[in-house]
Amino acid sequence: MSKITSSTLRTFKQEGKKFTALTAYDASFAGAFDSEGIDVLLVGDSMGMVLQGHSDTLPVTVEEIAYHTRCVRRGIERALLIADMPFMSYATPEQTMINATTLMQAGANMVKVEGGKWLLESVAMLTERGIPVCAHLGLTPQSVHVFGGFKVQGRDADNAQRILDEAKALEAAGAQLLVVECIPAPLAKAITDALTIPVIGIGAGKDTDGQILVMHDVLGISSGYIPRFSKNYLKQTGEIRAAVRAYIDEVAQGIFPGSEHTFN
């Protein structure tokens, strides 16, 4: 079983092969997702909401992400493992380096940061020092209070152009992957077409190179607000591994996300 790397994902993009990602927080679920063929696993700061019961992701700490990264690492053999850098853990380049090192030493293959042009120096610094970076644009949940809630981004021409420009700048700075969240599908397609690095969408239409969802949404065990872009695969399959396979198959076939999961 060949390990997934950023080079693998670039090859998928070049070949037009859609890939899938899920969040994971422990060895058992991560192992199941890995063995069924999920390509990318994210130890997300979404744990603040789905594991810890907070209303947003802001309370999550580097130590908590590192702990769960170690757990997931022990359970997987194939998938690329990304660790989220939580709120205010990368406010300065120096702080970014210290905390990213902690997460890489915990077993991550890559770290993910939310934000645009203000991150360019940190992205370049990490890349130059051997720490791969996944960037994240659009709805960046750590900025929920700036946005005034979990709202679709990039609907007007100026903001759409800004997001596209930031995507190009982050790639130029060295980012190896990009997540785009809750942006109009045409904008996501424009970004995907403009970049050579793979683009992973969540609530961004079907034209991105890959898709990511929160595992609790895929398994229908999220409490409270259920995002429009999510889909409960356990409901239609009745078994966890079958749910994961259905998600992988629907992404590969271009069935998911459908129009009901997409913003325009």
Swiss-Prot record:
* Superkingdom assignment: Bacteria
Q: Which InterPro entries match?
A: Pantoate_hydroxy_MeTrfase (IPR003700), Pyrv/PenolPyrv_kinase-like_dom (IPR015813), Pyrv_kinase-like_dom_sf (IPR040442)
Alphabetized GO MF terms: 3-methyl-2-oxobutanoate hydroxymethyltransferase activity; magnesium ion binding
What EC class is this? transferase
Reaction(s) catalysed by this chain's protein = 3-methyl-2-oxobutanoate + (6R)-5,10-methylene-5,6,7,8-tetrahydrofolate + H2O = 2-dehydropantoate + (6S)-5,6,7,8-tetrahydrofolate
Q: What is its main location?
A: cytoplasm
State the family named in the UniProt similarity comment for this chain.
Belongs to the PanB family.
Tell me which EC number(s) this protein carries. 2.1.2.11
Protein name (database record): 3-methyl-2-oxobutanoate hydroxymethyltransferase
List the signal peptide residues. Answer: none
Pathway(s) served: Cofactor biosynthesis; (R)-pantothenate biosynthesis; (R)-pantoate from 3-methyl-2-oxobutanoate: step 1/2
Q: What does this protein do?
A: Catalyzes the reversible reaction in which hydroxymethyl group from 5,10-methylenetetrahydrofolate is transferred onto alpha-ketoisovalerate to form ketopantoate.
Task: List residues binding Mg(2+).
Answer: 45, 84, 114
